[in-house]
Amino acid sequence: MTATPIDDPTTPIRPVDLFASFLHLHLDGRARAAEPVFQREGDGWQLMTFHVETDADVHGDHWEVHPEAEEVVACLAGGIRLYFRPERLGEAEEEVAVAAGSAVIVPRGRWHRIALDGPSDIMSLTVPRGSRLEKRG
């Protein structure tokens, strides 16, 4: 799939399947639908939507961090839990339940992971540049 310009006046206006594409929201105001590939080196924001069934679908065995921006994690259907890695030795993980129709804003630079309560639809928005994964110990 090649990038589909959403704001190009010569391109027909049509729906974008959010579960088959990622939306790239560029800093210059352009929006593009493209292959659902996480762009760690791109500019701007990336909107990602997923059908997920197991914790493996959300790499639940890894911590994730986004140093360039906050991340909005929304549960569209089902239910998820966000876990935040302790910032100090000896502290417990912080757990936040996210019901269908709600979202959490993950602070910039805060290590986090997702666990599912069951099959769910999730939407995420962040600046992916510099994002990292780290296997849970």
Segments from the language model and where they lie:
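Tight coil/turn sites that cap or link beta-strands
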Residues: 55-57, 100-101, 107-109, 119
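Double-stranded beta-helix
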Residues: 3-21, 57, 113-137
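Short acidic-glycine-tyrosine-enriched beta hairpin
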Residues: 87-108
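Short, surface-exposed beta-edge/turn micro-motifs
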Residues: 45, 69-72, 120
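Short, charged/polar surface micro-motifs in flexible loops or helix N-caps
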Residues: 43-45, 52-58, 77-81, 88, ...
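His/acidic/aromatic-lined binding-pocket segments of jelly-roll/cupin-type domains
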Residues: 64-65, 70-75, 96, 104, ...
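Short, conserved beta-strand element in jelly-roll/cupin
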Residues: 66-82, 86, 125
